[in-house]
From Swiss-Prot:
Its EC number is 2.7.4.3. Keywords: ATP-binding, Cytoplasm, Kinase, Nucleotide biosynthesis, Nucleotide-binding, Transferase. The gene is adk. It catalyses: AMP + ATP = 2 ADP. PANTHER family: NUCLEOTIDE KINASE. It is found in: Cytoplasm. Pfam families: ADK (PF00406). Residues 127-133 are annotated as: LID. Consists of three domains, a large central CORE domain and two small peripheral domains, NMPbind and LID, which undergo movements during catalysis. The LID domain closes over the site of phosphoryl transfer upon ATP binding. Assembling and dissambling the active center during each catalytic cycle provides an effective means to prevent ATP hydrolysis. This is Adenylate kinase. InterPro entries: Adenylat/UMP-CMP_kin, Adenylat_kinase_CS, P-loop_NTPase. Pathway: Purine metabolism; AMP biosynthesis via salvage pathway; AMP from ADP: step 1/1. It comes from the Bacteria. Monomer.
Amino acid sequence: MKNRLLFLGPPGAGKGTQAARICDSNGMKHLSTGDLLRSEVAAGSELGKEAEAVMNRGELVSDQLVLAIVESQMKALSGEGWLLDGFPRTVPQAEALEPLLNELKQPIEAVVLLELDDAVLITRMLSRGRADDNEDVIRNRLEVYRDKTAPLISYYQNKGLLISVPAQGSVEEITERICKVLD
């Protein structure tokens, strides 16, 4: 199974849930930028306060901040497999990440795109109960995804790394689909 992965997809598509399942069953490190940022917010650090204000507006945290977090996490890994969830979100971030991964001799092996309709995404996100999940913020996040993140689809498709997976159905069904395409 490929073990250096990137998950893409709109907010609410199940990236975090599926990433955790894939990592647990395959002994991979789950690098979730969303979780890293939320832990900074919970810690109340200056960085966390800055990130919280941006996230509460449904906007993206700066490239420099997220790349620094990812770099420190990647350097701490000793050759184990990893799954990057929530970064990169823009083509410039992907272009900044690539030389870092090449320097670490850990290039991405596959990019899994979880695809799901907006109506299902909105329903899922409203049911999560996160402070930053209200309908206006969710619609803004979907718009930001379309503007900033969706161009990554063609970026990774052109590199021959993109694998699309339908993200409807039960958690188990989606995990099974992902495992099948990664073998």
